[in-house]
Each structure stands twice: as C-alpha cells, then as structure tokens.
C-alpha cells in the first residue's frame, strides 16, 4: 500500500528534476546488499537498471522511493537531498508489476485518487484525469472497474494514476513482467510514446528484460552482486560493452579468446590475434601483448564483406536453424563456437561447409577477461 501512497501524495512538479545517487549504500541486518554506488540520471532522461535477480537493481529503486533507508550516501532529486525524507515528500510516483489498483473504484476514480489526496480543486482533478487517460489511450474505459480490464489495460491505468499527479520522477519496477509477450511488446511501445509526450519526466526503469531496456532507455546501468558494473548510453553500451558480463547480459554475444598486438593508425582500433587470424577491433584503450576477449554480436557477422576493411574468419558450419525471418548458424572458428544470425539466406549453407565470416572492425570489441 505504501507504493500507492507515493503516487497519491507526490506534490505537483514544476519543471524537471534529475536523480543523483552519491555513494549510496544499503545493508540489511549488517549484510551489504548494495555497495557504494554513484549515478546521475539527467532531468528528462530514461535510465533502465537491469541485472539478474538479487543484483541490487530493485534495492536502488526502493531507496530512491524512500522504502529502504540507506546505510550510507545521499539521494538527491533535483537540488533537494531526499535521503531522509518520507516517500510522500519526494515528488515522485511509482508503478509496480501488480498494478495496485483499488478494485472497488472505477478507472477514473483510481486515476483521481492521488489528486484527491492532494486536495486539488475538482475542476483540476477532472482535467488531469481526462488528460492522463487520454495519454495512455484509456479514455473509453473511464467508468469501468479494474476487474473488467485486461492486464495491459490495468497497467495503463496504473501509469495514468502515476502521471496525473505530475511527479518530478517516475519509478517503474518491472511493470510489464506479469503480462504475456504480445501485450508486453505493445506496452513497451506505449511507454516509449508516453515519454515522447512527457519529455520532461525523469524515469528510472527497473527490469530484467533486455529488450525493454534497449527499446526505452536513453542510458542503461547493469547491476551484478550489488554493484553497478556498467553504465552508459544505450547504443554505446550495446555495441561497445566494457566487460564480458555486460556483453552477454545485454543481448547475445560471441566471446572469443584474443591477444592484443598493438595500436593501429586508426584511433580506437587495435590489431588482434583471434580465431586463427589477425584482425582489427575496437578497444577502449591501448593494449599490447595482453590476453583479452573479443566480443562480436551474432548479427554483425555476414557471409559477404561489407567494405574493403572487413575482417574475416575462416569457419566450418556446425548446424543450421531456420526460424522464419531469421537463420541461426553455429560455426567452428579455430576450435571455438561462433553464432551468427542472418536474414534472407538463399540457398542455405549445409553442415560441414567451409565459410568465410565477415565483420567490420568497429563491430568487434576487445574486452577484459
């Protein structure tokens, strides 16, 4: 019920506010569950925190919401230190996976609940409710009860209730995990549209679903064992992950043994010995002679060169799996298994065929072991 209270009593926002976590630390009964974490979410930004169960991502969100008392560090929303403020004074709203709608109230009354708790004028309440329901595409369902709605519709109502109070910050705690795949896909598109319509809203989105994070977030933070192990702009983090865990958690990745040979004349590219060949790959820094790992996404491999600078691996096809629009190939490259995903392959290669796997230098990333 506290989660309802947060949205209900969040004071109306003026302007935009970001979130700053300054060495935030959380411990339960002396056991540290969140190691000192510093992170800035810019005003109007969508940041997705992802990670496996128990990684600490929900702990971060609950600390920002005010449901968990930090053992150290500070939490700022805008210019206000909210570390020791109760949830209802933080100017935020929260949406959780079980919707938390009042079953005895109509949709319009659920959406109006927070505004009435704020003792807003009736005319303003009606205006905000109408606008919020329109924003989430639920105007025609205003007089229905929650049990008359699908799961996706109930989640839209929960989001409408949250945005109706005009919070500075919106917290989303795995809001789509209880929905089936198709409805979840549609809701991801709806949340993306919502943020386009409300660009001033700062969103912290916690999920274990990489697709949701990649679709919605301006930036992504990856959690593991209570630590933030990677953080950056979504595209950059996907294409150039800093470590193996980030590479494999944020989409499929081929991880191959490699040795850095030295820098090249092209900034950011290094010569690498990998897969029985000397290739060029992207690197965050200058490396020479160190054992490294090479990360290549399956979809970045092709059977034909894309440029005069394309890298090449010689491979033997191990298996072919046709899945409609996509064909998955497993290949042996110098004793290591490499997966590739292709579209419009005709004719299909056969198991045992010798193949050349091509990829661009910037699509191969040197990472730490």
Swiss-Prot record:
Coiled coil: none annotated. GO terms for cellular component: ATP-binding cassette (ABC) transporter complex. One of its GO terms (molecular function) is ATP binding. InterPro entries: AAA+_ATPase, ABC_SmlMolc_Importer, ABC_transporter-like_ATP-bd, ABC_transporter-like_CS, AminoethylPonate_ABC_PhnT, Mo/tungstate-bd_C_term_dom, P-loop_NTPase, Transp-assoc_OB_typ2. Keywords: ATP-binding, Cell inner membrane, Cell membrane, Membrane, Nucleotide-binding, Transport. SMART domains: AAA. It is found in: Cell inner membrane. It is a peripheral membrane protein. Belongs to the ABC transporter superfamily. 2-aminoethylphosphonate importer (TC 3.A.1.11.5) family. This is Putative 2-aminoethylphosphonate import ATP-binding protein PhnT. It comes from Salmonella paratyphi A (strain ATCC 9150 / SARB42). The gene is phnT.
């Amino acid at each position: 019920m506290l989660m309802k209270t947060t949205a209900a009593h969040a004071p109306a926002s003026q302007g935009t506010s970001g979130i700053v976590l300054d060495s935030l630390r959380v411990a339960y009964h002396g056991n540290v569950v969140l190691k000192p974490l510093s992170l800035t979410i810019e005003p109007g930004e969508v940041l997705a925190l992802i990670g496996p169960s128990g990684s600490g991502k929900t702990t971060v969100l609950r600390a920002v919401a005010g449901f968990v008392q930090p053992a150290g560090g500070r939490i700022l929303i805008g210019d206000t230190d909210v570390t020791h403020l109760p949830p209802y004074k933080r100017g935020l709203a929260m949406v959780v996976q079980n919707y938390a709608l009042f079953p005895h109230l109509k949709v319009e009354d659920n959406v109006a609940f927070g505004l009435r708790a704020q003792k807003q004028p009736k005319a303003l309440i009606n205006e905000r409710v109408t606008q919020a329901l329109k924003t989430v595409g639920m105007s025609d369902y205003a007089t229905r009860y929650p049990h008359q709605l699908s799961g996706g519709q109930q989640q839209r109502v929960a989001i409408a209730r949250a945005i109706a109070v005009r919070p500075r910050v919106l917290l989303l705690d795995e809001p789509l995990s209880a929905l089936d795949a198709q409805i979840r896909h549609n809701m991801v598109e709806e949340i993306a549209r919502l943020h386009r319509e409300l660009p001033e809203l700062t969103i912290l989105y916690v999920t274990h679903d990489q697709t949701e994070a990649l679709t919605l977030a301006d930036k992504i933070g990856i959690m593991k064992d209570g630590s933030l192990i990677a953080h950056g702009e979504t595209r950059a983090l996907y294409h150039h992950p800093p470590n193996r865990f980030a590479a494999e958690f944020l989409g499929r990745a081929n991880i191959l043994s490699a040795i850095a040979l030295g820098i090249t004349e092209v900034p950011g590219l290094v010569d690498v010995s990998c897969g029985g060949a000397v290739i060029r790959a992207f690197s965050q820094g200058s490396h020479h002679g160190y054992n490294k790992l090479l990360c290549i996404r399956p979809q970045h491999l092709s059977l034909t060169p894309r440029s005069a600078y394309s890298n090449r691996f010689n491979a033997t096809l191990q298996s072919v799996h046709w899945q409609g629009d996509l064909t998955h190939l497993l290949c042996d490259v110098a004793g290591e298994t490499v997966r590739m995903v292709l579209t419009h392959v005709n004719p299909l290669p056969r198991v045992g065929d010798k193949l050349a796997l091509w990829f661009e230098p910037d699509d191969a990333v040197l990472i730490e072991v």
